[in-house]
Amino acid sequence: MKLSRRGFMKANAVAAAAAAAGLSVPGVARAVVGQQEAIKWDKAPCRFCGTGCGVLVGTQQGRVVACQGDPDAPVNRGLNCIKGYFLPKIMYGEDRLTQPLLRMKNGKYDKEGEFTPITWDQAFDVMEEKFKTALKEKGPESIGMFGSGQWTIWEGYAASKLFKAGFRSNNIDPNARHCMASAVVGFMRTFGMDEPMGCYDDIEQADAFVLWGANMAEMHPILWSRITNRRLSNQNVTVAVLSTYQHRSFELADNGIIFTPQSDLVILNYIANYIIQNNAINQDFFSKHVNLRKGATDIGYGLRPTHPLEKAAKNPGSDASEPMSFEDYKAFVAEYTLEKTAEMTGVPKDQLEQLAQLYADPNKKVISYWTMGFNQHTRGVWANNLVYNLHLLTGKISQPGCGPFSLTGQPSACGTAREVGTFAHRLPADMVVTNEKHRDICEKKWNIPSGTIPAKIGLHAVAQDRALKDGKLNVYWTMCTNNMQAGPNINEERMPGWRDPRNFIIVSDPYPTVSALAADLILPTAMWVEKEGAYGNAERRTQFWRQQVQAPGEAKSDLWQLVQFSRRFKTEEVWPEELLAKKPELRGKTLYEVLYATPEVSKFPVSELAEDQLNDESRELGFYLQKGLFEEYAWFGRGHGHDLAPFDDYHKARGLRWPVVNGKETQWRYSEGNDPYVKAGEGYKFYGKPDGKAVIFALPFEPAAEAPDEEYDLWLSTGRVLEHWHTGSMTRRVPELHRAFPEAVLFIHPLDAKARDLRRGDKVKVVSRRGEVISIVETRGRNRPPQGLVYMPFFDAAQLVNKLMLDATDPLSKETDFKKCAVKLEKV
């Protein structure tokens, strides 16, 4: 067999991914494809990360039996990462939940009782009583929901409607708060609109790739295979990788940079200074399309107001800024000299200069990629703003092959959490609850009384934990997320609230996760192709899939759960009289009738489905629920830069990148000839801002919330590994992936281990000011920390590393810093 170069690169990428999991390529094929006769195939996006790879799902006799890369999918072109090849097995773990479970004692609910099987009606009976009691006694602020960037688009939309319009509570937030909130605020501050302006097609046209806190080789391996192909096929292409420790992406790096935690802010300002000092500003672009502003500083760390760091902050939580001149900006970044930067970061001068030269060279098309290294950062918004500065100074933006690109970690952190607006402060299409005009638009479209949606921002993820602990949030429903394992400071700020007898906790999940086992009621959930769905990936690509099998037992989709539960409430039970008086025709109606079974949503008949097409929710209700919800939601974005295509178009396509105008998707936003919202002669227009100009921010270095000292003498950073996704609730139930990486380890520099009389394979106690875990010493693995730093993945439920993490957040985005806290080690 003769392989083309492209085929050779793909084959090597598959082999590398398979080898990482201890499998041969034929072994992968045999494990997931099996016998293809009589298998029915249909398309779907992958269930895992935000890359949005397309897969072909094979079903047989009511089960998913096979999965392969979709050769027609433009994202991955037929290639899967190792997790993608094992997608069928995530659905059939031996401990899959199939019926609701309630803590009971002597036949009744008891907070200290044992989990006991009950019916869905019984589950909703208990939930109804708890919700109504909380609403009556303490009001809408006493209930809350924690959702997910893994929700389908219509699940997130239905949840947001139920809480913000139905229950009149903005206490709904997604787990994307922990991963993408800093990116969102960064986009909004700089451009006035969320999400990247570029797309994956940039990869094949770029001259340089700079990774800021992104281990794409393991976390976005399919995109990394495309970057690898570009780098190895073109000797003039350069790859720079910046991180606080060495990882697999360094294997391709021409310039691999290890910097002191938090000092990425220094490097970013140094590069801006270098660009100015070397007259590398694109003056035409800069003068026409950019404003300069100086941001507020000393903004705190998002901790409780009583924390000493918050008391000491001069401008806690401030996102204020003021205009500044170019001369003032030039003077501001001039402080970040090469010498000072090298001293503060620990990076050799020659490496810093090489990096800066990539951005300054007018002939180099540069893509900046980042993920959690930037976002999970107490100055994550600033880091996002500062990397935009580099592209705005040089004009390397919104054109093929160059631009800043924020990568996402979840399959629909963009499509659901961000675009739908399931954050505590957001509404669809970049609208926000604090804006009266935005609330009015939603209330009119939803045909609910004016004033229904609260103007006050609800509780964000970390604030929800604190409110539960303080007894202020009393009924809490989490869906499609495992926050007891994934969130910070488990011992001090999360577990106390979940187990507080004042509070009732509901967890909807397919498996008995750490979160489920800490709850009071567990609802069994349909997953992936057991329901019809839609995700939006990192490049603004919206992708649909059909329901292909039915969920086991009594498991139901999150959408079904939300819609059916809404039947339990009448408007008089959730809205005050002054609202009902504005729309008396809504009296006596259930929230189901007001929010979901409306003429707008229910107008698409179930007959639009093919006779043999599964769709459990729509067939039960008698109308095409998913289509109705999507078309209502899509209305919000059409006409002002967030345009989604008609519903039916997505079932025909392998995804479309918004804005989709006149049937054509958009690859590059904000530039003439690429974006339908930029008129001829405008060149560039950042139309999220009233004047069409993007903002360069002057923002300084500020230290981390916690750093090593004499007692807690090591930095701890947390993250993921190739074989497991997030908390491992799916991937650890795949035998092959579990065997490949069965338990978490503590990656440590050999000299740090030796100084503590530790050897590879030893058990070690990792201790912070908040908790401790026992792990296993690893001095040779794929991750190579420098002296003074240790790294630990968070997929292992037996090693809850987030017991150790401080619940410090970026004060602007409220996103947790999972990359930096101080620990000490004790030999076990």
From Swiss-Prot:
Subunit structure, interactors included: Component of the periplasmic nitrate reductase NapAB complex composed of NapA and NapB.
Entry comment on modification after translation: Predicted to be exported by the Tat system. The position of the signal peptide cleavage has not been experimentally proven.
Binding site for [4Fe-4S] cluster: 46, 49, 53, 81
Protein name: Periplasmic nitrate reductase
Organism (species): Shigella dysenteriae serotype 1 (strain Sd197)
Family to which this protein belongs: Belongs to the prokaryotic molybdopterin-containing oxidoreductase family. NasA/NapA/NarB subfamily.
PANTHER family for this protein: PERIPLASMIC NITRATE REDUCTASE (PTHR43105:SF11), RESPIRATORY NITRATE REDUCTASE (PTHR43105)
PROSITE patterns cross-referenced by the UniProt entry: 4FE4S_MOW_BIS_MGD, MOLYBDOPTERIN_PROK_1, TAT
MF terms (GO), sorted A to Z: 4 iron, 4 sulfur cluster binding; electron transfer activity; iron ion binding; molybdenum ion binding; molybdopterin cofactor binding; nitrate reductase (cytochrome) activity
